């Protein structure tokens, strides 16, 4: 549980006190005024649809220990004094930076944590869930809830971690250069992985190389850790089929003294998968092996050939942190599918559906089509595809790729939903 005094929060974040006392202690942070109470810090954000500052008075009435706002709404200073709350204002009215500084301070107060950073274009949440499952075979683990992986979600993940936690698995997302540098500086991961470099957010970053370099920013925040289990030196896990792996290793990891683990299907990889097959339900079967000769057969509980690389990355990190390989693999193999990510939905007497509707990318759409067409089918195969956002000038080409990929599959019906980009798929 978080435990920081209001005075410590002011010092750590550079925020200013508008009104109210400074002698309280904050034990949790929320963005929802309905959760405000004694011991809680309510942080108001002016969002696109809702302005959290409008709910500051409600948080004060609920006796939140801290209420952070932009320009304080009328009457808030008086309410803070009346209810004994500390009303604060972030430096530059930057709520994101306030959270990052606060979470960074909490991280520094807990050097015993080994933080694992998870980033990549696709597969972050599934790999994060696999990692958390495998690491729990040995450690007390705190992990990102859902996909809270941005400049707000990552700090909230750290701020909800307890000093008794041993490993924190932190998913880190980005759609602009510089974001991962800020996230990594806050979380200070010791080990990290990059699932892949795809085309997600290419409209904002310009090219896949720019995406790769933005992902590689995670290296800049990595540092050794020391816990009851011993010292851990920084290492980064990469898939060997990542065509930017050499760039990331040579220009980022090596200069920073970060060891690189390679996973894939090459004989020289540190963790390998061989003999990959899919059963009638699309579930992968393969032989997992390590460079030292250890191997074990594996059948996964989630569909798709593409998830095998996620398993390899998770196993590489679990092994590096000293988790028994058999125990970690057993827990990972028994995991259910992550919600809305190639989730197979079935009901008696109803069609089998694959829900991959969360934040798709061209590569994840292709993976969903692969899974659909790998499953045994007694009826019709139907694909319903929507448009992919944040592709910029590459949108026509990449939507055309999706359409061509779908056309080459044994589908009985293809439904395209959208406007201009959907026409490009057709």
Question: Can you say where each PLM-predicted feature lies in the sequence?
Answer:
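Active-site beta-alpha connecting loops in nucleotide-dependent enzymes
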Residues: 47-50, 54, 337-340, 357-426
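Phosphate-binding loop of NTP-binding sites
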Residues: 95-235, 247-258
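Alpha-helical segments flanking ligand/cofactor-binding loops in enzyme cores
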Residues: 34, 57-58, 181, 209, ...
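Short, basic phosphate-binding NTP loop
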Residues: 2-117, 126-137, 152
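Short acidic/polar active-site loop segments enriched in Thr and Asp
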Residues: 65-66, 166, 190, 412
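Residue-level signal for inorganic ion chemistry
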Residues: 9, 40, 59, 102, ...
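Acidic, Mg2+-coordinating active-site environments of NTP-dependent enzymes
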Residues: 75-79, 193-352, 378-379, 404-407, ...
């Amino acid at each position: 549980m978080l435990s920081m005094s209001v005075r410590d929060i002011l010092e750590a974040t550079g925020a200013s006190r508008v009104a109210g006392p400074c002698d309280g202690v904050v034990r949790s942070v929320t963005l929802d005024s309905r959760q405000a109470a004694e011991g809680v810090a309510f942080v108001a954000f002016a969002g696109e649809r809702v302005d959290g500052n409008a709910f500051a008075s409600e948080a004060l009435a609920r006796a939140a220990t801290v209420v952070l706002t932009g320009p304080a709404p009328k009457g808030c200073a008086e309410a803070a004094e009346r209810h004994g709350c500390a009303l604060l204002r972030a430096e530059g009215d930057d709520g994101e930076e306030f959270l990052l500084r606060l979470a960074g301070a909490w991280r520094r107060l807990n050097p015993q944590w080994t933080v694992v950073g998870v980033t990549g274009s696709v597969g972050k949440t599934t790999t994060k869930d696999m990692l958390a499952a495998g690491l729990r075979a040995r450690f007390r683990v705190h992990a990102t809830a859902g996909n809270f992986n941005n400049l707000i979600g990552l700090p909230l993940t750290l701020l909800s971690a307890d000093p008794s936690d041993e490993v924190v698995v932190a998913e880190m997302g980005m759609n602009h250069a510089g974001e991962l540098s800020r996230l990594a500086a806050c979380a200070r991961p010791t080990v990290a992985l990059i699932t892949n470099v795809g085309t997600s957010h290419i409209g904002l970053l310009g090219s896949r190389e720019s995406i790769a370099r933005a992902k590689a920013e995670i290296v800049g925040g990595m540092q050794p850790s020391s816990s009851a289990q011993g010292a851990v030196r920084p290492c980064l896990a990469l898939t060997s089929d990542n065509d930017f792996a050499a760039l990331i290793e040579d220009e980022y990891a090596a200069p920073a003294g970060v060891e690189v683990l390679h996973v894939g299907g090459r004989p020289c990889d540190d963790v390998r998968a061989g003999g990959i097959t899919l059963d009638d339900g699309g579930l992968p079967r393969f032989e997992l092996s390590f460079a030292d000769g250890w191997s074990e057969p594996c059948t996964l509980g989630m569909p798709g050939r593409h998830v095998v690389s996620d398993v390899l990355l998770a196993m590489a990190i679990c092994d590096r942190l000293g988790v028994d390989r058999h125990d970690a693999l057993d827990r990972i193999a028994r995991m259910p599918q992550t919600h809305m990510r190639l989730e197979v939905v079935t009901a008696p007497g109803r069609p089998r559906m694959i829900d991959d509707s969360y934040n798709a990318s061209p590569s994840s759409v292709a993976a969903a089509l692969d899974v659909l067409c790998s499953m045994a089918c007694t009826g019709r195969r139907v694909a319903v595809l929507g448009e992919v956002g944040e592709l910029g000038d590459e949108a026509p080409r990449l939507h055309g790729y999706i359409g061509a990929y779908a056309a080459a599959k044994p589908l009985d019906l293809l439904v395209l939903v959208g406007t201009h980009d959907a026409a490009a798929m057709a």
